[in-house]
């Protein structure tokens, strides 16, 4: 019996003890548990990845909707600004035309007043000159009759 034999016997005993203690089953159970844990972690990672993809898709959709809404708001604001500008332009043009018409009316009234004033003064001067001429050349009775007739004529023409 040499040392190799005893080494073989010790090995067989050791393997027997391992089998008796169910070490291969524990190793298999430990490996199975580890494999199950890895499988669960992979499943969890897959689930988290799908959830992240769904969230990403949802956020991208919301971003597109927000961009579209912002674009619509900008377009609406531009249309509103154009309407306000055109409305202000129309109102300004109307205001200017009203002010121009009012100024033209005032000018026309001033012209009429000036013409009437000139006519009135011309009539007054003509009447005074005619009265003076008549007073110098005509006697009192004829002058008085002529003066009355002239005054009557002027009154009818002015009215």
Curated annotation (Swiss-Prot):
Output the Gene Ontology terms for molecular function: proton-transporting ATP synthase activity, rotational mechanism; proton-transporting ATPase activity, rotational mechanism
Locate the transmembrane regions by residue number.
Answer: 1-21
Membrane topology designation? Single-pass membrane protein
| Localization annotation | Cell inner membrane
Q: Which GO terms describe its cellular component?
A: plasma membrane; proton-transporting ATP synthase complex
Kindly report the protein's main subcellular placement as a broad class: membrane
**Record Pfam families:** ATP-synt_B
**Keywords recorded for this protein, A-Z:** ATP synthesis, Cell inner membrane, Cell membrane, CF(0), Hydrogen ion transport, Ion transport, Membrane, Transmembrane, Transmembrane helix, Transport
Q: Which family does it belong to?
A: Belongs to the ATPase B chain family.
Q: What does this protein do?
A: F(1)F(0) ATP synthase produces ATP from ADP in the presence of a proton or sodium gradient. F-type ATPases consist of two structural domains, F(1) containing the extramembraneous catalytic core and F(0) containing the membrane proton channel, linked together by a central stalk and a peripheral stalk. During catalysis, ATP synthesis in the catalytic domain of F(1) is coupled via a rotary mechanism of the central stalk subunits to proton translocation. Component of the F(0) channel, it forms part of the peripheral stalk, linking F(1) to F(0).
Q: What is this protein called?
A: ATP synthase subunit b 2
- Biological source species: Chelativorans sp. (strain BNC1)
């Amino acid at each position: 019996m040499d040392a190799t034999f005893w080494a073989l016997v010790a090995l067989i005993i050791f393997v027997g003890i391992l089998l008796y203690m169910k070490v291969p089953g524990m190793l298999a159970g430990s490996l199975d548990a580890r494999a199950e844990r890895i499988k669960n972690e992979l499943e969890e990672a897959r689930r988290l990845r799908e959830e992240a993809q769904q969230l990403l898709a949802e956020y991208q959709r919301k971003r597109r909707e927000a961009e579209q809404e912002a674009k619509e708001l900008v377009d609406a604001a531009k249309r509103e600004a154009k309407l306000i500008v055109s409305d202000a332009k129309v109102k300004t043009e109307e205001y200017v035309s009203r002010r121009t018409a009012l100024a033209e009316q005032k000018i026309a009234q001033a012209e009429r007043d000036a013409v009437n004033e000139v006519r009135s003064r011309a009539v007054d001067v003509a009447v005074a000159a005619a009265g003076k001429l008549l007073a110098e050349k005509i006697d009192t009775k004829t002058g008085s009759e002529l003066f009355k007739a002239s005054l009557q004529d002027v009154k009818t023409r002015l009215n």
